[in-house]
Amino acid sequence: TLSSSSAASDVYKRQVFTLIVLFSGIPIAFGLSFVSIALLVSFEGFQMLDVFAETFYAGLNSFVLLSIPMFILMGMAVANSPAGKDLYIGLDRWLWRVPGGLVISNIGACSIFAALSGSSPATCAAIGTMGIPEMRKRGYSDQIATGTIAAGGTLGVLIPPSIVLIVYGIATGTSIGRLFLCGLIPGFMLAGMFAIWALIHSYFIDKDAAKALKNRKRPTLKEKLEVLPRIFPFLAIIAGVLYVLYGGVATPSEASGVGAFLVFVMIAVVYKIYQPKKIWNIVKVSMKESVMIMFIIAASYLFAFTLSQLYVTQSLAQSMVELSSNKWVIFILINIFLLIAGFFLPPVAVIVMTSAILLPVITTFGFDPYWFAIVFTINMEIGLITPPVGLNLYIIKGITPDVSLSEILKG
């Protein structure tokens, strides 16, 4: 039996080895798989290779996971239609008199699009492509134009149907429908806080916003009304998907399939997108995104199994419990850990890798697992706009290559 000091030393060595591999530039899924195989073989022997294959498969052997590619397909269908543009234009025309109305329009469009796609990158790309050039054209600073979309895009991981919450539900065994319900109000509250900040900033601080409002041509009532028929069908789909989820009519997997089907019907009717080539392009992009996420989930599941098999999970959980008897001290330390993890890893990987460690600690100290899920997700939101990974930052950089990453980060 190893002493406690040598056991702790082994845990730290494994952590350092994992970090070295992940920071080497290897794709996350391949890096986690390599670390898992190396650790299992070195400590347990080559007979663990069979277990490796079984565990990798088990990580994807869940019917609920079917909802992820369906929601991605739903989001990609909307992203490849002019829906984002119509959402943006519609909100802009109705909010034109409000100081910072263009910023608020972007945030509102991000919120609605997030409820359609469940994906932060898709939200950034769809709304940013239209919103950023328009804001720059009307005199807003590059920081405000890019930062608004980068931050607004993070709502995609909190407002249901959120892929991150689906993965959390699968990893922790919590109800996905209840997680969606828990994320709904905080998501729109966060969007409201973004909007209030935009209003205050534009009215009292940002002179560019005042100039943009002064130079703005007033939209006519006809222009305001003509965009509504293009927006209402998508709002109806959001309401329908949420209703069948919360009303107990369908499971998340079934609701995602119905939502994807309705979105395809809607883009065919409203935007005349029904050509096989265009549909295939949407499906192809969705498949690539889905396979990437599924690979990360399977590799993270394998990594979590490896940590548990080598008693790393149990050691870390016990160490965290012994750090302090004050539950709020533990809560703050967990938040710091999640923030740092979110800086370097995608949300899906962080959830699958750490939930087995953190959930027992959280429940031991009496925290509600659903409440903690929202706190967890908000930490992942921060990671999406924080270097060195900061996925949203690089998506915005791709839309505006002439704006430096530091300017986007300041925004």
Predicted features and spans:
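Juxtamembrane helix-boundary/capping and inter-helix hinge elements in multi-pass membrane proteins
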Residues: P82-A83, R97, M130, E134-A145, ...
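Generic alpha-helical transmembrane segments of integral inner-membrane proteins
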Residues: K13-F23, F34-V41, P69, L73-A77, ...
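Single conserved hydrophobic/aromatic residue that forms the stacking wall/gate
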Residues: T1-A8, Y12
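Hydrophobic transmembrane alpha-helices of multi-pass, membrane-embedded glycosylation machinery
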Residues: F17-L19, F34-S42, M130-G131, G259-I267, ...
